[in-house]
Amino acid sequence: MQKIVSFLKKKKEPNSWSNFDRSDDKSKSLSKKGSLYANGNYDGGGSGSGSGGSSSNSSGSSRKINTGGNNRNGGGMVHSPSNSSISSTSSNNSNSTTASSSSKLKGNKNRNSSGKQKNSSSQHQQYGNTYYLDDECDSDDFIPGEVRSISKTIDFSKSERKWLTSLNIPQELLDGNINVLLNVLNFLSKKEGILYIQTPTNIINNTGKKNFQQQQLQQLQQQQQQQQLQQQQHQQHNHQIYGNGNNNNLNVNVNVNGNNNNSNNNNGNYTSYVNSRSNSIASNNSSITPSTSCSNLNNDNNNNNNNNCTDNNSNNNNNNNNNNSTTTTTTITNTNVNMIGASNINSSKSNLNSLLLSGGSNGNGGVDNLSSTTTSLSQNPPIQPMRRSDYNRIFIEPGKFYIFPESESFALARLVVEEEDPSKLFRIGENAEVKGAFGTVYQVFYVNGQYNNVDVALKKMDHKSEKKRRNNLNEISILRYLKHPNIVTYINSYEKNDEEIWMVMEYMDGGTIRDAISNFTFTEKYVAYITKEILHSLEYLASLNIAHRDLKSSNIMINSKAEVKLIDFGFSIDLTHLKQDINMCGSPFYMSPEQIQDKAHGLAVDIWSLGIVVAEMVRGRVPHHKSKIKAMFLAGTVGVKFSKEKKYSCHWSPELFDFLNVCLQMDPTKRPTPTQLLQHPFIATAATKAETLDLLPLLFMSKTLSKLSRGRDNQ
């Protein structure tokens, strides 16, 4: 009897995997970043901008990680600002700056500085031996609360092994690709505060694994302490600069009217802003490629020296007394203070992120006038968070960008209209709101101005943390620049009370393709029509070297005019100079193998995602839709294949099979370009626009009936 009682009282081993492995249909709250009209976005996994996985946006909550005992050593978030301080901007055709724009720049600069200090202080709240992780922390700087060493599946807990068994994945495949499995788990379990690391093969006993794990935790803790010390030194130095230094006059033209204007300087030159935090700004007359970023010029005795930052096609003529030193992917050139170089904080499995310090992938690096003191990066750094390669950039146009956070004020002034209460500009429409994990989208009507009584989509985005501010401004800038019939039209953006950004876009009354799939069955010719329209948008993006990186059915919309458009550019990246990135971001079911394998990826990731979307449209659901772990692991190891022997695909045409096969190539170099896919025989079977217009009433009726049915079920 005593054994029975003790058995009943025994706590069941917790299984955190059930929190993130469910499909989006079963657990909407797991999405990290909602699209305009639907949930289901993820960003992260051991890397990336917001590297980390299923992180729902719960308001005002914090997560507590115990750092004492039972592997709960370490933990906490580390705030690591960028140090590049030279950015470039394109100005309006006007040569004067309005007084309101100037005052806004000044106000934004002061506010952003105080905001960064606020975030920095609120992100690490340590009481005793416990870290409290605020949900608003920048997850780029994630330091795990628990590190688990895994060499084979036997090293997982009992409940985790049971969960893996339920996925029906061959044991040999799991053990042979344990690194891919750990990548998947790190991507999905980031919010749980857990980091899985692969144990070296020479560590075979528990003692060795424990020692290895302790070494990793110590490295993480030392890294955290070093970064905090560097932060303090950096802030002290900036404080000295505020009280000393010669300020130059700033002449920058700011576009705040929200129209889709691609501003260019009259003479084709770009102004270089140096140390925008301290208002110490130097400019030159040479043509500057903004993507060629230089290191921070934190020198108390700058005395208005001209520092020319050029690309390969520009002449660099420096007559200053400072020595010239070239930054490389393995060296950071420092000034007379111990700076927080981006690569010092962010070195990881690849040197790609160091390209930000060397001016992209041009091979020559950025040439700066700096002191000769250099700090070499470790060739074998400890486990550290990895960011997307453009983590400190705000897009201007392909190949040109602002440096973040130093030039955040200029980007904000150019992209966003400051409005104390933007709600007075709109009235709410019938479809009041659609909530996403990172924002709420409303159907609204403008009450005056150019778009009076025009229904638009209004997306409210939180704008408090540093990461959110960068992502919001980058998404706005990209969408503002893009102009294509198959990309949703950007209208304007407003800042409310320094806490929210309201982004206004065209309203798509037909909803997302994902909504349509859940209520309606498409035949192949309509699938081909939608695919053709999306290929046109991808062809346009490829011509600009921009990868969307979150292509999925809930980011494709249709309207009553049979127009199909791509939305949500939050994970998009300009690859003009970077060429490739290493970053697990996007949505689990649509992620390409190279991303899952944590390898460099480029424009071809969108072709893989398109193949999954096409399969979803004809089948009604994505492959392995019940489990994110299984879907990602199999995609990253054996790929996705479709067979005519299956019941659901026995009626598919040969053209469809071939289209899916070429899109879902494991090797990204073998995937065709959007232009090549537009010539594929499957696209030739597409319905006409007139035929699609005839289909829309049935589609909308099915959607309405489904909404009414859900409403009755919720009562």
UniProtKB/Swiss-Prot annotation:
Coiled coil: 207-241
Xref: SMART domains: S_TKc
Keywords: ATP-binding, Coiled coil, Kinase, Magnesium, Metal-binding, Nucleotide-binding, Repeat, Serine/threonine-protein kinase, Transferase
GO terms for cellular component: cytoplasm
Family matches, as InterPro entries: Kinase-like_dom_sf (IPR011009), PAK3-like (IPR051931), Prot_kinase_dom (IPR000719), Ser-Thr/Tyr_kinase_cat_dom (IPR001245), Ser/Thr_kinase_AS (IPR008271)
EC identifiers of the protein: 2.7.11.1
Active site: D550
Enzyme class of the recorded protein, top EC level: transferase
Record-listed ATP binding positions: E433, V434, K435, G436, A437, F438, G439, T440, V441, K459
Biased composition, class Gly residues, residue ranges: 42-53
Co-factor requirement: Mg(2+)
Catalytic activity field: L-seryl-[protein] + ATP = O-phospho-L-seryl-[protein] + ADP + H(+); L-threonyl-[protein] + ATP = O-phospho-L-threonyl-[protein] + ADP + H(+)
Region (Disordered) location: 1-125, 228-330, 366-385
Keyword Glycoprotein in annotation: no
Protein name: Probable serine/threonine-protein kinase mkcE
Organism: Dictyostelium discoideum (Social amoeba)
